[in-house]
Amino acid sequence: MESQQLHQNPHSLHGSAYASVTSKEVPSNQDPLAVSASNLPEFDRDSTKVNSQEETTPGTSAVPENHHHVSPQPASVPPPQNGQYQQHGMMTPNKAMASNWAHYQQPSMMTCSHYQTSPAYYQPDPHYPLPQYIPPLSTSSPDPIDSQDQHSEVPQAKTKVRNNVLPPHTLTSEENFSTWVKFYIRFLKNSNLGDIIPNDQGEIKRQMTYEEHAYIYNTFQAFAPFHLLPTWVKQILEINYSDILTVLCKSVSKMQTNNQELKDWIALANLEYNGSTSADTFEITVSTIIQRLKENNINVSDRLACQLILKGLSGDFKYLRNQYRTKTNMKLSQLFAEIQLIYDENKIMNLNKPSQYKQHSEYKNVSRTSPNTTNTKVTTRNYHRTNSSKPRAAKAHNIATSSKFSRVNNDHINESTVSSQYLSDDNELSLRPATERI
């Protein structure tokens, strides 16, 4: 009895997976599955009865044996029109379906899937609204006229997927997902779907259509086996089995994080300091880089940080290399303190330096002109030194000496009220000042 039912309905295990696949949606002259899909039996809404066309149904070899796998596995697919694909890391032509990627736009392909954990199946209606769990990044789809004027190269609301697009390679391990998703995003861009892919800021230019959503959903799981996906991707798909957009958004965000990590490592390895900026600013810059790496689960030890900093020191700070060369227990805080100490000492020394006077040439003439008079008077000072003239320093010494002796003589003259004053020398002479005359 059971074998008879299987003979009568060989596709009952697949439900209505191919019910809506008709020749209207997929051109018969391009799609390799058009012949088999157009002759498939039509099922009613309950998927329990089969009409009289059951006798013309092709063999079961074109249907995958595992009904939890969504990607079609036809028995034989002709090679793509643009020749064989490169086999390096790419799917074989019979799996790629590259002769017409529009096959993956069929919404009915989304009804059977091992990603599926929700009973809310998609209806095979091209005008079915987008699911509400997809974050609406734009309020409404752009007007085709305005969009064509502003972005002529951007696909419109209903994008025709390009044929003969090089497929991404199949995901082989969980560790390679971050690399694989880059190729998958490039594949979507080559398929005229670049404006619905999140950019570096997580923004998209327009909302995807229902067919585009089905296309992304089907191609994603066709090239990314569920058991090879990372844990965070599985958690998203277990909640909403077709929310591929959220997966792409978080993947782009993780790419940006990885790029920032690379930039931080490059900045840390190329540190340079010569005292041109304050030591506090240098310390804040280095500490910020180390803290950002720590937030991404990358710990930079004090010894490694000190070695990278010492490598970039120059000028008066260069001698710290020899001081820390023999140290085994390096502390980053101690190194920052010594850099701050040297910076403060140099700052104080620069403030205490005497001002440099501008030196004039010995043969330079300084002229002063009086603009208010009719006859211009020019005063010329010639600093040409003669042979008989004394140096300027000697003249200054003589002036200071003469002023000293004149100050002493004035003191002796003013002391007239003193009765006598004795000056002792080797001969013990006694001198009396002249008496005042009344």
Curated annotation (Swiss-Prot):
Gene Ontology cellular-component terms listed: cytoplasm
Q: What else is known?
A: Retrotransposons are mobile genetic entities that are able to replicate via an RNA intermediate and a reverse transcription step. In contrast to retroviruses, retrotransposons are non-infectious, lack an envelope and remain intracellular. Ty2 retrotransposons belong to the copia elements (pseudoviridae).
What task does this protein carry out? Capsid protein (CA) is the structural component of the virus-like particle (VLP), forming the shell that encapsulates the retrotransposons dimeric RNA genome. The particles are assembled from trimer-clustered units and there are holes in the capsid shells that allow for the diffusion of macromolecules. CA also has nucleocapsid-like chaperone activity, promoting primer tRNA(i)-Met annealing to the multipartite primer-binding site (PBS), dimerization of Ty2 RNA and initiation of reverse transcription.
Name the source organism.
Saccharomyces cerevisiae (strain ATCC 204508 / S288c) (Baker's yeast)
Q: Where is the composition biased (Low complexity)?
A: 369-381
Where is the protein found, in the record's own terms?
A: Cytoplasm
> Polar residues compositional bias: what residue ranges?
1-11, 19-39, 49-60
One GO term of the biological process aspect: viral translational frameshifting
Q: Does the keyword RNA-binding apply?
A: yes
Is Plastid one of the keywords? no
| Major localization class | cytoplasm
Q: Where is this region: Disordered?
A: 1-88, 364-397, 418-438
Q: Describe its assembly.
A: Homotrimer.
- Comment field on protein domains: The C-terminal RNA-binding region of CA is sufficient for all its nucleocapsid-like chaperone activities.
In this chain, the site described as Cleavage is at 397-398
Q: Which UniProt keywords apply?
A: Cytoplasm, RNA-binding, Transposable element
Q: Which InterPro entries match?
A: TYA
Q: What is this protein called?
A: Transposon Ty2-LR2 Gag polyprotein
Region RNA-binding, as annotated, extends over 295-397
Q: Which GO terms describe its molecular function?
A: RNA binding
